């Protein structure tokens, strides 16, 4: 089943809920896992039985299924703004619920989860909305529980001269996306947000995935290139919907794409992510 973005309630999501998106997210999952080595980086004691884990923005629950493999009888909850990709029937000990990060969470969920996880969702909100969402996610963790978030990051200043076309693309999107209610700088902000909402022991892992020719592993490099091209295609589609009086022109983005194609064919490109985690203060 395909659910188009126009049918999603109060959503800034720019991609349809269909098999193409499922394939893209599975490949993205595999890429990130290959470079982080594991799915749960927060220092949660994974030997404890009956851990309660929430995955916000779960899509089809694949992260939950994979993350649960080393755990003993975990209680898993997945949420998303659309039920279109929810597995039916759900896996054992797993429940799925419709939930937007901008809406109030169920009162019965407050202070109940050992781990609250979310990946690549906050960029689809404004900076203020992102901070509010993180505060609400933190409230779902039990005292002593953990919150782990993943967001994309822009190029570091030292990398901009190596990938000039990619830097131009980021700069264009950074100017364009606020008009869609997005925040491409979420990956730079999210670690600070964890501290701002009162979490402790905040940690961060920076993940860099070389794309195409820049990657010494041909398989991972090709996967990364396919994923990056898919995402860039979304921005191309979004730019075509800009109003005629917009200061951002689709033609400008097309020029950047031409240069980026040359860049990726000659030296490759780069994907960057921030994985951050923090602990809810324990009760005295």
Curated annotation (Swiss-Prot):
Segments crossing the lipid bilayer: none
Gene3D superfamilies: Vaccinia Virus protein VP39 (3.40.50.150)
Any one of the GO BP annotations: methylation
GO molecular function: methyltransferase activity
EC number: 2.1.1.-
Top-level taxon: Eukaryota
Biochemical pathway: Mycotoxin biosynthesis
Assigned keywords, A-Z: Methyltransferase, S-adenosyl-L-methionine, Transferase, Virulence
Family: Belongs to the methyltransferase superfamily. LaeA methyltransferase family.
Function, as annotated: N-methyltransferase; part of the gene cluster that mediates the biosynthesis of sirodesmin PL, an epipolythiodioxopiperazine (ETP) characterized by a disulfide bridged cyclic dipeptide and that acts as a phytotoxin which is involved in the blackleg didease of canola. SirD catalyzes the O-prenylation of L-tyrosine (L-Tyr) in the presence of dimethylallyl diphosphate (DMAPP) to yield 4-O-dimethylallyl-L-Tyr, and therefore represents probably the first pathway-specific enzyme in the biosynthesis of sirodesmin PL.
Name the UniProt record assigns to this protein: N-methyltransferase sirN
Species this chain originates from: Leptosphaeria maculans (Blackleg fungus)
Lineage of the organism: Eukaryota, Fungi, Dikarya, Ascomycota, Pezizomycotina
Gene name, Swiss-Prot/TrEMBL: sirN
